[in-house]
Amino acid sequence: MQEYNVVFSETAEKDLDDVVEYLSNFSASIARRYYDEIMVKALSLAFMPQRCPFVQDTALREKGYRWLFVRNYTVFFVIDEASSIVDIRAIMYSSREYTALL
């Protein structure tokens, strides 16, 4: 089984920081749980990232964007097969309109 290197873009890192900061306003323990769960699921993309579907937007799908849902957040990523890299591009609240943000 091929293993991929999972990397986070600066945008995705900031997105995750923003999620944690927002949730910390309500509960530090909830913020920590969300952070841990998002990281575990994102890092699981090192194995079989193709298990996640392509996004619904045609233009982004053509660019290779896929999504992974973690509770009420969505992790957007692309796979570089030639380099065996999963590039996490963004993490955002699932109800947001993602097409203009990616």
Each language-model region and where it sits:
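Basic, Lys/Arg-enriched alpha-helical interface segments
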Residues: 1-62
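Proteins with a high burden of low-complexity, intrinsically disordered sequence enriched in S/T/G/P/A and R
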Residues: 23-24, 67-68, 102
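Basic/aromatic recognition patch in beta-strand/loop cores that engages polyanionic ligands
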Residues: 52-81
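Enriched for short, Lys/Arg-rich terminal
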Residues: 70-74, 78-102
